[in-house]
UniProtKB/Swiss-Prot annotation:
Gene3D superfamilies named among the record's database cross-references: 1.20.1270.10, 3.30.420.40, Actin, Chain A, domain 4, Substrate Binding Domain Of DNAk, Chain A, domain 1
Gene that this sequence comes from: hscA
Keyword ATP-binding among record annotations: yes
Family note: Belongs to the heat shock protein 70 family.
Protein name: Chaperone protein HscA
Length: 616
């Protein structure tokens, strides 16, 4: 009888049988696919040798085209040519229209308020459009590798929230791809540069792509990639450079009509061409809509200077979060096509005090890092010692009594991670508990972001504090959050997976972090006050129950003293004097000490009644 061949789950059964994996950089402006061949990561070109695939899809009744062919139709058929769809991922229609009022598409809202784009091929959502781009990349990889892909790693901006990440995974499934992992784009760059250069120490990954900006501060040490801090802007990128330059050309050409989509596209194409040319030339000639003129690099720099400054402010915040100074950073990795702009490289170099690294093509570095990670995850490198640690951008926690936020997982905690915390019931015979999941850095619920609510029912009716509920937060490698609440004595539990209907607003993460610093002292005082008020309410409720049950143990004078102390506590608890509330609580405790001792004696006597000493 032949022996069964056994291999570890996820690894190749045959020692020399490589599984086919790819890394995909699903970008706002351009996308790429890469793989590892003969030990080297490389991006895969199309039949014409082009490695970039424009993230553009042109829809017709008979079908659709993706990439360069689609982009060529943008000026003639704007409404059916969808570009920069990544910016729409995980957002509501209202959010998209508020952020990007000049988009030339015909939008309709679905029943849940999410966007649908009306095209010649019918109503399409951003997930479907993204899936068509992924299909084109997967087809390129399968043809190049002569086989079907066993799995892919897809990169996403560090700022993508749960809804945006889930939308990306849904798009991949729709494209028929097995997602090994979603990987933060800056982390993919760290993998690419970490393996190529072997640097150890703190590095900054400055990623300015077409639609998003991310800054990550990482520590590389002995094959370990640890993200110390992240920051950025989910709605800032090279596209914004293009639109600023297009508006400038419009003004110079005297074009007032913004309703002509064909002219809009011509202006944008002219701006993109000029931007690329100005990376090498000091002056470029522009010919658009019958107008001819010159644009200098100096004029272009003036237009984009404020946007570049915004990226450096985010860099400063990330460095502060990481607890390092610019001079502590050994290397600065430049990622994204927009980092080819000379002003960007110049300002970044000045900020960090060193020349940025551009050894790997900034357009390809993300895909290369994703390919390396995919090769490991698919099982081709089982002996790899590389460890990858991503982080969550904002703290996760729960609402507790008094409108306070109890942080369960602090921001910048590496993922995947699971943390648990025990809570007790507040009232006697409490049989249910509302779980309110929060995100943010402030101390009070009103200053943080609500992620989800659910209820745990079936808690045994015990005295206040008698039931113990364990709440577990689990963030997986893709940054998706699951929360489970379980009553420990019975095992009854409830859980929820957090999938917000749309993403964070522009700058929300940055402003939440900034506010937590600006209002730190105020928040601490507010928390202390809220905690004292909660304790006062607990003491008063407990005292009320005790008096109802055992008032006969007190004399009239003793009862009066306790009532006076309770009334005083109730009164001061309405105010904002933390010390006064604390002293009033201590006074109630002092006045009720003898009462508590008598109740304890009475309970002991009742417990011993009818039992002999030997039985005790």
């Amino acid at each position: 009888m032949a022996l069964l061949q056994i291999s570890e789950p996820g690894l190749s059964a045959a020692p020399h049988q490589r599984r086919l994996a790819a890394g995909i950089d699903l970008g706002t402006t351009n996308s790429l696919v890469a793989t590892v061949r003969s030990g080297q990561a490389e991006t895969l070109p199309d039949h014409e040798g082009r490695h970039l695939l424009p993230s553009v899809v042109h829809y017709q009744q008979q079908g659709h085209t993706v990439g360069y062919a689609a982009r060529d139709n943008a000026a003639q058929d704007t409404a059916n040519t969808i570009s920069s769809v990544k910016r729409m991922m995980g957002r509501s229609l209202a959010d998209i229209q508020a952020r990007y009022p000049h988009l030339p598409y015909r939008f309709k809202a679905s029943v849940n308020g999410l966007p649908m784009i009306d095209t010649a091929a019918g109503l399409l959502n951003p997930v479907r459009v993204s899936a068509d781009i992924l299909k084109a990349l997967a087809a390129r990889a399968s043809e190049s590798l002569s086989g079907e892909l066993d799995g892919v790693v897809i990169t996403v901006p560090a700022y993508f929230d749960d809804a945006q990440r889930q939308g990306t995974k849904d798009a991949a499934r729709l494209a028929g791809l097995h997602v090994l992992r979603l990987l933060n784009e800056p982390t993919a760059a760290a993998i690419a540069y970490g393996l190529d250069s072997g640097k150890e120490g703190v590095i900054a990954v400055y990623d300015l792509g077409g639609g998003t900006f991310d800054i990550s501060i990482l520590r590389l040490s002995r094959g370990v990639f640890e993200v110390l801090a992240t920051g950025g802007d989910s709605a800032l990128g090279g596209d914004d450079f293009d639109h600023l330059l297009a508006d400038y050309i419009r003004e110079q050409a005297g074009i007032a009509d913004r309703s002509d989509n064909r002219v809009q596209r011509e202006l944008l194409d002219a701006a993109i061409t000029a931007k690329i040319a100005l990376s090498d030339a000091d002056t470029v000639r522009v010919n658009v809509a019958g107008w001819q003129g010159e644009i200098t690099r100096e004029q272009f720099n003036d237009l984009i200077s404020a946007l570049v400054k915004r990226t450096l402010l985010a860099c400063r915040r990330a460095l502060k979060d990481a607890g390092v100074e610019p001079q502590d950073v050994l290397e600065v990795v430049m990622v994204g096509g927009s980092t080819r702009v000379p002003l960007v490289r110049e300002r970044v170099g000045e900020f960090f005090g060193r020349t940025p690294l551009t050894a790997i093509d900034p357009d390809k570095v993300i895909a290369i890092g994703a390919a390396i990670q995919a090769d490991i995850l698919v099982g081709n490198k089982p002996d790899s010692e590389m460890l990858l640690l991503d982080v969550i951008p904002l703290s996760l926690g729960l609402e507790t009594m008094g409108g306070l936020v109890e942080k369960v997982i602090p921001r910048n905690t590496t993922i995947p991670v699971a943390r648990a915390q025990d809570f007790t019931t507040f009232k006697d015979s409490q049989t249910a508990m509302s779980i309110h999941v929060m995100q943010g850095e402030r101390e009070l619920v009103q200053d943080c972001r609500s992620l989800a609510r659910f209820a745990l029912r079936g808690i045994p009716p015990l005295p206040a504090g008698g039931a113990h509920i364990r709440v577990t937060f689990q963030v997986d490698a893709d940054g998706l959050l699951s929360v489970t609440a379980m009553e420990k004595s019975t095992g009854v539990e409830a859980s929820i997976q957090v999938k917000p209907s749309y993403g964070l607003t522009d700058g929300e993460i940055a402003s939440m972090i900034k506010d937590s610093m600006s209002f730190a002292e105020q928040d601490v005082k507010a928390r202390m006050l809220a905690e004292q008020k909660v304790e006062a309410a607990r003491v008063l409720e407990s005292l009320t129950g005790a008096l109802t049950a055992d008032a006969a143990l007190l004399s009239a004078a003793e009862r009066q003293c306790i009532d006076d102390a309770a009334a005083h506590l109730s009164a001061v608890a309405q105010g904002d004097d933390v010390d006064a509330i604390e002293q009033a609580i201590k006074n109630v405790d002092k006045q009720t000490q003898e009462f508590a001792a008598r109740r304890m004696d009475q309970s002991v006597r009742r417990a011993l009644k009818g039992h002999s000493v030997d039985e005790v």
